Amino acid sequence: MTVAMAPVIPHAVSRQRTERLARSSKPFLARGGPRGERCAGCRLLPSHCLCALRPAVPTRAGVCLLMGDVEALKPSNTGWLIADVVADTFAFGWARTAVHPDLLALLADPQWQPVVVFPGDDVAPERVLTGLACNAGPAAPHSASGKRPLFVLLDGT
């Protein structure tokens, strides 16, 4: 028996993958089933599809993923899992020499307080963030600064 599911709305990483595939000169062949088939929603073998189990997590936080050129193509990309769960996920390809104008606009948007998620081991102690002054819950008022946290993850993996 086959269960019909509503189509999954493409999220930021899915759109990044589609855009990257459009620029590709050859097919991207990730390891997979006998013929490389994967569910378009969760990128697992169709027999192991998790799309019906995808949770919706209410949160005020957003996530900005800065990914290498082919990262969105990889089925093991954990940024895809974040985008599956956090509605306000943004994904951008990253290159040192060119910055996407939408990324600059997102970082300058007054509703967001960008926070780069990075190990603090080799960082001056005064630059390490150990907490955010935000109220919990999706319906909570804005933080004391009036901004929502935007966690910036480098490479999204």
For each feature predicted by the language model, list its residue ranges.
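Histidine-anchored nucleotide/phosphate-binding helix
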Residues: 52, 73-85
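S-adenosyl-L-methionine/SAH cofactor-binding core of RNA-modifying enzymes
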Residues: 87-157
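Short hydrophobic beta-strand segments
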Residues: 62-72, 113-118
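Short Cys/His-rich Zn2+-coordinating modules
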Residues: 16-32
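Detector for small/aliphatic-rich hydrophobic stretches
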Residues: 2, 9-11
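Short metal-coordination and nucleic-acid-contact micro-motifs, chiefly zinc-binding Cys/His arrays
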Residues: 35, 45, 59
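Short Cys/His-rich "knuckle" micro-motifs
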Residues: 47-53
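Short cysteine-rich clusters marking metal-coordination/redox-active sites
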Residues: 39-42
